[in-house]
Design a protein with these regions (language model features):
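Active-site neighborhoods of divalent-metal-dependent phosphate/nucleic-acid chemistry enzymes
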Residues: 76-124
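Residues that scaffold the ATP/ADP-binding catalytic core of kinase and kinase-like folds
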Residues: 12-14, 52, 129
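Short, well-structured N-terminal submotif of metal-dependent ribonuclease cores
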Residues: 1-41, 56-68, 137-140
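Short, conserved alpha-helical segments within structured domains
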Residues: 41-46, 104
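Hydrophobic helix-cap positions at the C-terminus of alpha-helices
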Residues: 30-31, 73, 111, 136
Length: 140
């Protein structure tokens, strides 16, 4: 299975004080143990990780620190990681995308699908996305 990790997954995984850190870390750990799993990032979720990381701490985490944390996260994925180039235009959105707040979700969902991947998220309400489970079974 191939997953594109969205901003919510990256932020929860990257910061141990996040309410969903353990859930996300467990899912990523299980995914890494599965032989046929690829975990993708792209520029939009990576930029979102840096932005949210700085904003959620009121600037106590700097852009440089957030970038360094992200680099460590990507390195931890090892051979399971692929950086997905964003080759999709942002001119059409599905019917469920009726507010500006959902445009990035819709774009990432289409980007993932166009490359044979599934968008992995902690956000409910994204039709067709994979919502990380609250409990991860042994082995994933």
């Amino acid at each position: 299975m191939t997953y594109l990790l969205d901003v919510s997954v990256l932020v929860a995984w990257g910061w141990s004080d996040h309410v969903d850190h353990e859930r996300t870390a467990a899912w990523i750990g299980a995914a890494k143990r599965r032989k046929a799993t690829t975990l993708m990032t792209s520029a939009i979720p990576e930029l979102g990780f840096v932005r949210v990381s700085v904003q959620r701490t009121g600037g106590r985490v700097t852009v440089a620190e957030a970038t360094e944390t992200l680099a460590g996260m990507v390195a931890a994925l090892g051979a399971r990681h692929v950086l997905l180039a964003d080759d999709r235009a942002a001119r059409q959105f599905p019917e469920w995308c009726s507010s500006a707040l959902r445009t990035t979700d819709a774009h990432l969902l289409e980007l993932a699908a166009a490359h044979g991947a599934t968008l992995a998220t902690l956000d409910t309400g994204i039709p067709g996305a994979f919502l990380l489970p609250t409990k991860v079974a042994n082995g994933g």
